[in-house]
Amino acid sequence: MSPVNEVRVAWPGARQGPAPEAPHWSDVAHWMRPGTLQLVGQPPLSLYIHLPWCLKKCPYCDFNSHEWREPGGAALPEQAYLDALRADLQASLPLIWGRAVHSVFIGGGTPSLFSPEAIDRLLGDVRALVRLDADAEITLEANPGTFEKDRFRAFRQAGVTRLSIGVQSFNDAHLSALGRVHDGAQARAAVEEAARAFDTFNLDIMYALPGQTLADCEADLRTALGFQPPHISIYHLTIEPNTVFAKYPPRVPEDDDAYAMLDRITELTGAAGLARYEVSAYARAGHRSRHNQNYWQFGDYLGIGAGAHSKLSFAH
């Protein structure tokens, strides 16, 4: 039998020698090159809409929000802003062409300053321009300081499916320290009406507030839980740059006291049947915010309106 000799064939242009090592994950320049990463599918898509006006700029707020102070109490330029939002969305359509939107979040500012008729037109424009899922979650942020008895129901009729109420606290002294325009009684009335008008809603609560004790924090939380909300967002007060609080820092609880507050929050929300599913959000079964989850799971979102931004994925 003839001996078998190993034969190596080098095709023209073929690389000789061992295969090169794959670039390290930290080589951002490499991985950002078009075509380097191929997506087998795209994540869910959400829509964020920013309405920038509020009655009063809170001293801790670093969002793109602006007090509406017009001579003679002139009304908000609702129609002009809605025209601009529609144009913004139309200009963005090539970025999301054909993709379905599974959640909408209308934030601010104070979106509840806009009339229910304006919100109705806004959502009509959205439905006319994008593929909105039939069961899409549509959240509107509301301030108890803009609460009127029939207003929340009118937002529901306009197509809003979920209300997020910026309560922050039920304690009048703490609300005053935060620069809020509502008091505890208004907050309670707003929550009661939201529970009547909506199948699901969220309460925003803050802790580690100026002058707040552990007992104060627990009282706020027990009041909130007394309304049996399906969802609560609980935020530690943060002193952000370029805010009034950054320029004039208030006296806030020590870190150990704030940790004790968080431990109590975790205990009380768990006992009330609210499961923590992200850093600041607690929900009953079936009431997690799809919009929040999409953010935390690195989904896609298109932002329209003053100061809004987007995060979008493309196949290549």
Question: Where do the PLM segments sit?
Answer:
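Intrinsically disordered regions, especially transient/low-confidence alpha-helical propensity segments
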Residues: 8, 22, 28, 50, ...
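Flexible, acidic/Gly-rich N-terminal and inter-domain linker regions that tether
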Residues: 1-48, 55
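C-terminal scaffold of the Radical SAM
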Residues: 35-46, 64-316
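Local cysteine-cluster metal-coordination motifs and their immediate loop/turn environment
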Residues: 50-65
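A residue-identity detector for tryptophan
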Residues: 11, 25, 31, 53, ...
